[in-house]
Amino acid sequence: MAMKKLLIASLLFSSATVYGAEGFVVKDIHFEGLQRVAVGAALLSMPVRTGDTVNDEDISNTIRALFATGNFEDVRVLRDGDTLLVQVKERPTIASITFSGNKSVKDDMLKQNLEASGVRVGESLDRTTIADIEKGLEDFYYSVGKYSASVKAVVTPLPRNRVDLKLVFQEGVSATIQQINIVGNHAFTTNELISHFQLRDEVPWWNVVGDRKYQKQKLAGDLETLRSYYLDRGYARFNIDSTQVSLTPDKKGIYITVNITEGDQYKLSGVQVTGNLAGHSAEIEELTKIEPGELYNGTKVTKMEDDIKKLLGRYGYAYPRVQSMPEINDADKTVKLRVNVDAGNRFYVRKIRFEGNDTSKDSVLRREMRQMEGAWLGSDLVDQGKERLNRLGYFETVDTDTQRVPGSPDQVDVVYKVKERNTGSFNFGIGYGTESGVSFQIGVQQDNWLGTGYAVGINGTKNDYQTYSELSVTNPYFTVDGVSLGGRIFYNDFQADDADLSDYTNKSYGTDVTLGFPINEYNSLRAGLGYVHNKLSNMQPQVAMDRYLESMGEYGKDSFAADDFTFNYGWTYNKLDRGYFPTDGSRVNLTGKVTIPGSDNEYYKLSLDTATYVPIDDDHKWVVLGRTRWGYGDGIGGKEMPFYENFYAGGSSTVRGFQSNTIGPKAVYKKGAHSSNDEYDDYEECTESNGCQSDDAVGGNAMAVASFELITPTPFISEKYANSVRTSLFWDMGTVWDTNWQASRYPDYPDYSDPGNIRMSAGIALQWMSPLGPLVFSYAQPFKKYDGDKAEQFQFNIGKTW
């Protein structure tokens, strides 16, 4: 064997040593140790070619180049006569990646981070990268207070230079905060300051936000909260001098000490605005007014800056710069605020684009826009477009993005990015509701028919007390000005006694047509005409029913038919932030109808529904909801409102915890009537001369219902499904009464004209917008009820109801 000369040291990992510095001409290049890497690929990565004259520097560059490919753990370059011998040791290939012991970090997240670092199945194993990942993961655990955590990479060799990579986690437990000390505070007590922190050394049972488990990120947020607390109260010189986080020897306890300098309180002496105000100095001056002697307030200063930006944004200045510089006068303890404004260029909208609307037509979204193409960019108009899209109810999320046009100094494109939700379904199936029993459903319900914005429904249902079918169509943009046109035809066979109501059967059919007129962004009016035919039978005489029949001149009959024509009207105020599962805003809906000439009945009826959502955190995860429902109706010209038009309460949509429609006046059957009351055998004849009290609800011509709910984050639900599931704690109350009840005539029975007989319940509810339709579950406990009321703690409904 020929004498081999060792040429140069292998960089970083291992090498040979240079024995000669003279150059030589390479006649051939030979590799040893290649397995997975092709010879051609290795040659391409080298700066040396056959025929080149090489020296020590060339050899060093060759080694560097081979290491730079990431394919080799070791590289040696040797000379064998005129042949360059390259000895390599390839890095092993990763055959599999597994995890063990990780609970805080999910497998999918770990895989994403590993892939971002180039660690994936089929790639070479870089031990340096693995070591960095180990340290990075341990640092993450330390940042969330798990100081005893460890992460170890276990590499198991396999045949053909392959390895299995396994990351073994020992997460340990989170260190608990033992004590938080604030040093240097004189104006406020430590307890008062800590009460605004997320991290706490003591957490009362009612505090759902506080946390004793240490997290570095939360501490940073709490320190910023502390800074803002002082700056908002005039302490312009406030400073956090240092923060010490001490760990107990067993790594299970944390002591936090925050050293601060409060300084003195300062008052604002004035605000001076300078710069390019784009001709809006008067409006900006209004935004910067201060009260004499007002304390310096950091939050108000930030809000003032934001208000100036919003003002300029409404006039097309999309990227204004607003900078406040406080000039502190320590002598008289005042601050003069200098505000420099640079409005920048005025921008115009070149195009408005929509992304993600795979079903909805562009025209359906575009007609909701208030920002026009070719006009200057108005941030308020862009936001209005987002609000209107959200209120349609077609989308899970709506986001906006303003993109500058390349090469143009004053043009932007406005992009609305939507995520569509299922706005309808074709269904044929069986459902069950505690109010309706077994239900058979068939139909098509689509709120965004073929992406046109039309609401179309062909629906039918059959349950224990009702057979119902309906065809409905609504065009929300019957005219380009937003006038809507809707209509429906329906048929209903209603067995009242099976719905916990007084005994009668009503077969009805009808139609109605309604026009809607937008007044402004949030208000609209409705007007329309309707026709309904009611055919009643099997009427068992009871006081409220007889009173109506007597007013119609039909006293004593057990069957009756009426044809009514109605003028229908309504008003809606809607400022909710989205069409389903709102978290902010209010909605008011007033509906009414009155019979018109040609009708057998003469009456009017009004209903008012309100809902107000108030978020109590920035993320809108915690929301307070208040709802009310009011109803009143009465006869006209000596006639009574039909008893089958009465208001009812009880059930999942009014007062939960009570059976559907059971709250309020009960039937007092006349002598000779047959009652389905539980106190009697079915259809036993009433023999009392003054009538027989029953538990059958008859409703009333007046109703009041209120509900207060605390909407909470749904536990055990991932963020992916957060927009389709909602949980809440609620308190319901309601009453139904009959203003025409003659208490003096029936002294032996409850006074059903008294509106003070309020029922109350409290409980928990879960709503899920499932692929089958809305699922609503509730559990409520009535805590104020009256004789004859029927409790039903657990209630649920599956599928769409009509």
Swiss-Prot record:
SS bond list: none
Residues forming coiled coils: none
Alphabetical keyword list: Cell outer membrane, Membrane, Repeat, Signal, Transmembrane, Transmembrane beta strand
Major place of residence: membrane
One Pfam family cited in the UniProt record for this chain: Omp85
Signal peptide annotation: 1-20
InterPro entries (UniProt xref): Bac_surfAg_D15 (IPR000184), BamA/TamA_POTRA (IPR010827), D15-like (IPR039910), OM_assembly_BamA (IPR023707), POTRA (IPR034746)
One GO cellular component term: Bam protein complex
Domain POTRA positions: 24-91, 92-172, 175-263, 266-344, 347-421
Domain of life assignment: Bacteria
Compartment list: Cell outer membrane
NCBIfam families reported for this sequence: OM_YaeT, PRK11067.1
Protein family per UniProt: Belongs to the BamA family.
Description of how the protein assembles with itself and partners: Part of the Bam complex, which is composed of the outer membrane protein BamA, and four lipoproteins BamB, BamC, BamD and BamE.
Function: Part of the outer membrane protein assembly complex, which is involved in assembly and insertion of beta-barrel proteins into the outer membrane. Constitutes, with BamD, the core component of the assembly machinery.
Name of the protein described by the UniProt record: Outer membrane protein assembly factor BamA
Native organism: Escherichia fergusonii (strain ATCC 35469 / DSM 13698 / CCUG 18766 / IAM 14443 / JCM 21226 / LMG 7866 / NBRC 102419 / NCTC 12128 / CDC 0568-73)
Upper lineage: Bacteria, Pseudomonadati, Pseudomonadota, Gammaproteobacteria, Enterobacterales
